[in-house]
Every structure is written in C-alpha cells, then in structure tokens.
Amino acid sequence: MFARIACSPSGKGVRQVQPIAIRGARVHNLKGVDCDLPRNSLVVITGPSGSGKSSLAFDTLYAEGQRRYVESLSAYARQFLDQLEKPDVDSVSGLSPAIAIEQRTTSSHPRSTVGTVTEIYDHLRVLFAGVGRPHCPRCGEPVTARTAAEIADAILETAGEAPVSVLAPVARGRKGAFRKELDALRAAGYHRVRVDGSAFDLDEAVPLDPRRNHRIEVLVDRLAARPASRRRLIASLERALDLAQGVVLVTIAGEERLHSRTLACARCDVSVAELSPRAFSFNSAYGACPACQGLGWRWRVDADKVIPDAQRPLGDGAIHPWQSHGSAAVREALEDVAARHGFSLDQPLAALPRPGRRALLTGDSQFQGILPHLMGRAEKMLALADGPEPDREAFENLRPYLSETECASCHGARLRPESLAVRLGGRSIADYARLTIAEAAPALRAIPFADRERPVADRILPDVIERLGFLERVGVGYLTLDRSTPTLSAGEAHRVRLAGQIGARLQGIVYVLDEPSVGLHQRDNERLLGTLMAIRDLGNTVVVVEHDAQTIRAADYVVDLGEGAGRQGGTVMYQGPPATLNGSLTGRYLRGELRVPVPSARRAGTGTLRILGAREHNLRGIDVTIPLGTLTVVSGVSGSGKSTLVDDILFRALAAGLGRKTAAPGRHQALEGASAVEDVVAIDQRPIGRTPRSNPATYTGALGAIREMFSLVPEARARGYRSGRFSFNVKGGRCEACQGDGVRPIRMHFLPDAHVRCDACKGRRYNRETLEVLYHGRTIADVLDLTVDEAENVLGAHPRLRRLLATLSAVGLGYLRLGQSAVTLSGGEAQRVKLARELGRRDTGRTVYILDEPTTGLHVDDVARLLQVLSRLVDAGNTVVAVEHNLDVIKSADYVIDLGPEAGAGGGRVVACGTPEAVARSRRSHTARYLRAVLRGDPAEGAA
C-alpha cells in the first residue's frame, strides 16, 4: 500500500519502507488518533481551523522525535537543551530524527539578518578567516607576513641586477635626540644612517631636534641583486628585521619598498591581528564597529519628530517631548534663549530667524539645545539599559523622537576598519553581504583562489552556494544578505527560516512544516512546492500542516482532520492520496462542490485616501488611491512591496497624523484624505500575551464582565465579595498554593520540568471559598472552561458578553476555551482574537482597519466566515485594507491594488488596480492569471 502511495509525481516508485505509525494520539483535542504516514513522501495534514492539525504534527510527531533525540544524549548535555514534554500517545513507530519549522514571527532583533539566520554569513566568516587577504585599513595596501627568504626572493624576481640597499627603520615619526640609539648602532659596527631622508656618517654628529618627529633608517647592506648574492641578501634582511622590530626598507634603483614579517603595514605602522571568524562578527567585540557596536546605525534625535508641526506656537505644546512633562525650569530656559535671539515663544518654529532656530535646536554658549539635551538623556538611558526597569521605560518614552541614522564610522557595514580591510576577490565581507542572494553565488564562484587556498574554499563554499540556490529557488533572490530580519514580510521570513533549516541537503529526516505557503503568491508557492518535492526526493519525509489547495493536490498523502474544531475536532476524516479525498468538508471545497461566492456588487466607496510618491524600500515613487468605506486588498508577488506600502507608510502615516507615538512613516511625499479618518487599527499576528495567565477572556475584556457578573450573585454580595475576588492574578480569591496558575512546576534538572495539577485547587485556579459562589450552577472556573460556543448559550443574557462572544464565534473561534492560555494560540488565532476585540467595540464608523494576511491558519470554510465579518465592518462605514494572497479574499474585495510585477528591485510598481474583474484583465499581473480562474468558478486555487 505505502509503496503505491509514496510514489513520486514522475511515476518512479519508492522502495517498501515502514510507515510512521501513530497510535492513540490524545494530545489536546485529538481523540485517540491512529494514522500511518508513508516515509519519503510529501504528507499534508489539513482540516478546519482548530481541528487538531498542529497537535498531531508538532505536539505529537515532532515532539516525540525531538524527545527521543534529546534522551539519547548524556545527562550533562540534556541540561543545556530545550526539552518537550512526552506527548500523550500510545506509540509512534518508524520515526526518524525530526526538524520542525513553525509559522512564527522572526526575530525582531536588529542584529538578526538574512545572512545570520541562514548561517551563510557564518560560513563567510570562516572563509575570510581562512583565506582572506588583509590590507592596511589606512592606505589600503596589501598586508602580508613574509620571512626574510620570501622577501629576498621577491626582490631578486623584480630587481634584475639593479643595486639594492637594505635599511632598518629604527625610528618612524618619533620625537627625540636618539643619542643612546645612535651610540648603540655605532658600537654594533654600523656606519651609515639616513635621517629624515638625508644620509649621515655615524662617526659625525647627527643633527636631531628633540622637539620634532624624525625618521631614522640604518644602512645594513648595499649589494647587487644577483642570484649568487641570495644568501647574503637574506642575512642582511634578517639583521634589518631584527633591528627594526620586524620591518625592513629596501631601495631598488632608487625606488623604496617596505616589507614586514608580521601582519602589519610597514608604511603606516598599523598592525593587524591574526584573522579569526570572530574578527568578522558584528556580534563580537573583536569584530564589531566600536562606534555603533555592530548595529550599522546610531540613534539621533529627529527634529521633525520633536517639533512635528512647525506652524504651532512653541509655547503651545509644539515641542512634543515637553507637552506634558515640561517643567518651570525648562520654560524659563526657553524664554531666556528666546530673549537672547530676538524671538518669542508665541511664534512657531517656521517663523524663527535662522540663528534663533539654530540656538533653540542645537544650543548656544548658555543653552544646551533641545536636540543635544534629548540625545544626552537617550544615551544615558541606553547606558543604563541593563539597569532598573524605570530606566528602560524612560528610554521607551524618548524613542518616538529618535531616528536611526547610518553609522558615520563604518557606513552601515557594522565591522571594525581592520575587519573591513580584509578582502577576497577584491571585496570585503560587508561587500558580499550587501549583494543580493542572486548576485552572491556568481560573485563567490568568481573568486580566484590560489592553490594553497583551494582546500579551505572547497570545504566551505559548496554549502554556501547550496543555501543561496535554495533561497533563489523559493523566490527571495532579491533580498540582500545584510537585510535585517525585522524588515521582512511574513512570507519572506518563513522562506529564510526554511533555508536555514533545510538548505543543507540532509537525508533521512522528518521535516514538519507549519503552513509554508503563508505570505506566498501562487506563483511563488509553485516554486516552494518544487523545492519541497526535491527535499522529499533526497530521501526525507516532509509533513506539512496546510490549507492551500495547490499544496494539498501536490501531496503524496493527505490526512484530513475534523469534522469541526475544538471538541468537535480531533478525528481523522480521511487519510490517503488526494485524488480520493471526497466526503469531507475539505474534499467538497477541493472538488468545487462548495466555494466562496463572488459578491454580486462592489462598493464604490465614500471618499479616498491617496498616498503620493511612496518610495520606501523598493517602492518606485508610486501614487496609490485607496477608496474609503471599502474592503481593499493589496496583492502581488512576495516581496513586491505590499507590507512596505500598507504597514510602513499607510498605517504609520495615519497613526502619526492622529498624534500617536509610532515609528517614522516610510518615505513618501504626502497622504491626502486622512482628515476623514478618526482612528486606525493594525491587527497583526503577534501574541496576545506571553504568559499562561493571558487568555481570550482577559484580552477581549470578557473576564472583567464575568467577574462583575459573579460579584452580583446574592451569595457573593452576602459575603462582601467584589469583582476583584474573582481574579486569579491577585491575592484574595485565587489559590495561593499555585498562585492562580492551576499547575505547579516540578524541577527535574536533567529532564524537562514537569507540571502537575495543583493539589489544593485541582487545577481550578481559585480557592474553595471563591468556588462556592455559583452562577446558574457553575463556578467561575467552570465558566472559564467553556468554549466560546458553549458560553454563548450560558452567558447570552448578559448584553456585553453576548456581543463579545458572538464576535469570537463569528471569526471562527467558537472552539476556543475562554480560559485557554494565550501561549497555546497560533498567530492566526491571535490575530482573530484581536479582530474580535475590535468588533466588540462601538466604533465611530470612520476607522481604518489594517490586516496582514488575515487568512493565516484558516480553512476555506473559515475564510468564508471571516469575509462576512470584514463585510460587517465595512457596512458600518469603516475601511478595511488587507495584505493578502488568498484568491477567495481577493475576488471578494471591492478594490484591488496589485503590486509588482516582480519582487525586490523588479517590483515596487502598481501593476493593476480596480475591481477584481478589472485586475483579472491585466496581462502584466501575475495575480491576474490566477484570479481569472477563480472568477470563472474553477475549483479552489486558494485555501481548502
């Protein structure tokens, strides 16, 4: 059976191998799941959101593989590794080593780059340390360490039979009379010296001014450059090198050449340390630029952020940092500088004379200046960054007034001058890091390695070239290696992480991937599928949690979970090849029996927002119109500039216009029409909380209403319990044995910490007295254990709770328990909880909602429900702008802005815009090709 199922699409069979057999999996909502996954195959686990896909793939399959590997190590090694709990499963057989690549936010640390995440930069550091060619950081001349024999051979090779003088530079640019040194040279038998370019006999008085810098060179030998004189030349060079501490000056027919037997520039007297990988690390003090500590940029106070409105009177809150915190002393200092320079605080900055403006911003002899004052405070806070919490908070208060500016010392290269002066193929390591992925491989192949360098290069470069090739094959060849990972889109970040994990061409591995299609255009997804199949063909098992129809159809084997979510899920509805996936909800969408309908009409909008001259990152100075009161989708191939346009420019510009503290908007000329917007809300996929105490009830505010409801129960009122009694975060009503966690950790040292149910409260978080208060026969612990759908029936009489619960259910989260820990939620679930909270608020009807890939983690049936929710927002007079690749969402939009045509430097332009039908007619748009099919009603090409 499995030999047939595991056949590759080309028809080539695979040898009979034991499947990965999972028996009795009961993790989370799995109901004793049994399934057999064929080895050396592309396996897709699909099903409705919340049906248990991640529980099976990650919390069972990967967790068991990782646990077995860690337990095979010594007790000493295990204490340094993260260890997963043993999954609740009867058995897993046929399992080989497992690697998980989850769908999560990439590192937000500015030191993280594409090169470091993929380890390409680490390989380059080793390469440069092994065969890099040092140059002087001052004059740029090559720096080599040569023996006297090597120097002699170089002289004989180039000098012909010209006369050669060997001199020892005993003093270079030093002050002094040097009497002792000259006497010692005379006693050693030397007769001639050259001082500041003039020759003198040591037997005569040498005129030296002790107040001036001098150059003193001792003549060691003068001879003709003949092969017969080689031995004498070597001996003379060795004497000169000893006299001058490793440096010798050779004149050949009047031309001077400095040589050194250490890594030092003889001309500039600059020594270079022995090369090591850490010398090229911007995360190490040995390699990082001392000015910026390896960041490539430094903070500076931005005058435009400090005084954003140059037409507002200075004394009327124009100076933003001092709007609410300006003291009387600050006011007095400003009045003094105004009096000295002839202006008034009733004037705006724009009306000040140039000297007065300069004095106000940068200071004069009596006033420090606003910008230096704020910069001094920021630097003090940065210096205390490892200190008490208030210092970090103070820096965060200043951060909205700071901008990043390129480091003037390293010009963004992050490294010390000595490290940047090491070259290979005429380039520094920073030069290679600035290349795009597509440019880097040819540049590295073209390096002319010497024969002695080739063995080192041959051990390092193949792996680098392989990883670069993988990145190019999955469509991110336009990224540079030094691109900071916080600036990557979700799709770019996921593919970069993929390269870091699977670019090494391992074999016999079980790869477990979480929605690799997220953030990918359909064209890019085809490339990714080709790569996953190539990994499978190497002899690996690729297990993918996925909703994408393209991926499901391309699979060798499908496991479909359902039939619903949460407690209604956790059952295998189907397992086998995709061709016979019929009866389930997923199968009906795949065959086209069910589909998301195309709207019968498109909204025209109630006004417009216009972004003019957008040129951040790869945007090409484009003008973009967004109709208000519509669902607008920004589409385009991955890396075309969608997130830059929507997140970096639109959201930040609207937020700044509303007076919010935010990062500086991306470069653009103007944003027109913003006066029609009363609020802007970005709903992203970041976690709603980072501790087990945070949950959907606390985040949406439902817990506050539940606590208030319990405090009004007659029993609670009789006991004097207020709403705070029903909080598990504070003393009073919570169980003090576990401090409201419901579990207690047991330190296991060489094994993972075990968490056992609290004996005192039996996992219910509250003390006995609090749990004696009942609402319709349920304790507050019982209520928090209800799913959203169950809670609607129990708590529906409460108006505020009814609205909050209805919105959670409407966004497809009816299966979540109210008290479910936030750390267990996926990025897509977290985003929908945030969306539900926004829906539960009473808005003005003039809000712009910005969503980034809202269909992440959604089955196509859930996408249909999400579209209904977004339509409700728009029908209330709001505007929804979504960055999205899902074709069901694109076809349901009122207006589409398609960017491209390609990624990176080949993108950043508006390829097509208008209704989905208008965009589908474009011949330049990659999106149009796929959009035409779904508008015709062809079987699903998007999610399933």
Identify the residue ranges that each predicted region occupies.
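Conserved phosphate-binding elements of NTP-dependent enzyme cores
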Residues: 1-944
